[in-house]
A protein has these predicted regions:
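Catalytic alpha-helical scaffold of carbohydrate-active enzymes acting on polysaccharides/glycoconjugates
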Residues: 1-87, 92-140, 161-181
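Glycine-rich, positively charged active-site loop/lid region within alpha/beta enzyme cores that binds
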Residues: 134-156
């Protein structure tokens, strides 16, 4: 409950203070569990993107299961926000061989799961194409702070100062080359 109850209000206030709008990729189950938070995100002008239902990695699902997860998450997000999500970020940032086609068929405007560039680019989606807004593991907090003994992930959490230095250097490098962060 720390994330939705303590961290998110702080993050939202910080974004408001600087006039920044952000994209939040939310699993359907989390949206159902924290409806007021999702409504607050939308009322502040932030984008809500699709992030699975129970954070299922698409590569572990067959095509029908993956389609059902996409449809279920989309229905939940539409019910809460009033809008069909435009963007998708895969749980675990891994896609199946069917993912891009399924996203294209459902009208998603973009995916944000791949790392083929450091600016948006077009990817083949079977019978069409979709915009890819790339991500990078270095810019995610998970590798630095994840601690989950149940999953065998017992790394010592990184120093926030060290992570800030990494992210700052990444920002400066991408900024200098006029790339996306």
């Amino acid at each position: 409950e720390y994330g939705p109850s303590v961290a998110m209000p702080r993050i939202l206030d910080l974004l408001d203070d600087y006039g920044i709008k952000a994209s939040f990729f939310v699993p359907g189950f989390i949206a159902e569990t924290h409806i007021k938070l999702i409504e607050d995100l939308v009322s502040r002008g932030h984008e809500i993107g699709h992030h699975g239902y129970m954070h299922e990695p698409p590569a572990t699902l067959n095509k029908e299961e993956e389609a059902e997860v996409l449809d279920r998450g989309t229905a939940i997000l539409k019910k809460i926000t009033g809008n069909v999500p435009a963007g998708y970020r895969s749980p675990s940032w891994e896609l199946s061989n069917n993912s891009l086609q399924l996203l294209h068929d459902r009208g998603f405007e973009y995916d944000s799961s791949l790392m083929g560039n450091d600016i948006p680019y077009i990817v083949n989606a079977g019978s069409g194409s979709i915009v890819e807004v790339p991500v990078h593991w270095e810019l995610d907090d998970h590798p630095f702070f994840n601690y989950s003994p149940y999953l065998g992930q017992t790394n010592v959490a990184a120093s926030p100062r060290h992570v800030f230095e990494i992210w700052s250097a990444a920002f400066e490098g991408l900024y200098n080359y006029r790339r996306s962060f």
